[in-house]
């Protein structure tokens, strides 16, 4: 009796699957482990080796929504420009939706962004910005879209109204609708959409953090990865400030264990210091030895003091690449950066 029941069940399931495929097309439903099933998540490097390791899959996931937020001048746009530069190195097409109208092309070029290949839009309203994003994603020809920033996506009704008019919840409704529309086409087209967001303070919070991000709660739910980026100190050359010490915390991660954090240097005019990261991660992984203020790799002394060691690695590309490969191997990441050593030398 049980075998007859299971045969009937199987028959009913097969006819249901056949009906779904007839109605919605082949591939609209499939077995997770079968052929043409959902593949492993592809990742795109962030330009920071430490952050790639902290994210668990070697970078940010393709075909997902990512949110990067933090206080002013913390390095949000710098980090996304590095993501664009890394994607362009792999031959990807990238777009930058500049709702803040504040992108500096010369700075972007210094970080390695190919301006000739970068698509840029400076929309007038939030609806226009999200419509442009949706069209780019649906085209299937764009690999990465950056929206800078959610706070600057001003709803049309707010722009057309007077300065003092109250428009409670309009921004949140706009974002909520956009997330519902975007999420399916983002997954199908394998395009990553990065939203940069700002921080606001909640009034009257007694316990817990009073900080919140703009645009309501929808983006928090739909994001596969959320990164909190903060400036934690200044980097000085004698009395002159030449960069920021930066901490990034992976607040949410749907593709690997979350809550990891990483620290790196952002140098003014250069971006993320790759050589500084190699030293810090190399010491942690036991690839680089540090005794007192001296850094050494194998039998070779790299330099006395962090800045001297960074200069040595900039000048000796082969040693920098060897250290990077060993760090990647220690964390189980691919050796995909060894072919082009230029990016080590830049920072």
Curated annotation (Swiss-Prot):
A Gene Ontology term for the protein's cellular component: cytosol
Keywords: ATP-binding, Cytoplasm, DNA damage, DNA recombination, DNA repair, DNA-binding, Nucleotide-binding, SOS response
Pfam families (UniProt xref): RecA, RecA_C
Biological processes per GO annotation: DNA recombination; DNA repair; SOS response
Chief localization: cytoplasm
Chain residues that bind ATP: 70-77
GO molecular function: ATP binding; ATP hydrolysis activity; ATP-dependent DNA damage sensor activity; damaged DNA binding; single-stranded DNA binding
Gene3D superfamilies on file: P-loop containing nucleotide triphosphate hydrolases
Location within or outside the cell: Cytoplasm
HAMAP family reported in the protein's UniProt record: RecA
Described purpose of this protein according to its UniProt entry: Can catalyze the hydrolysis of ATP in the presence of single-stranded DNA, the ATP-dependent uptake of single-stranded DNA by duplex DNA, and the ATP-dependent hybridization of homologous single-stranded DNAs. It interacts with LexA causing its activation and leading to its autocatalytic cleavage.
Family note: Belongs to the RecA family.
This protein's name: Protein RecA
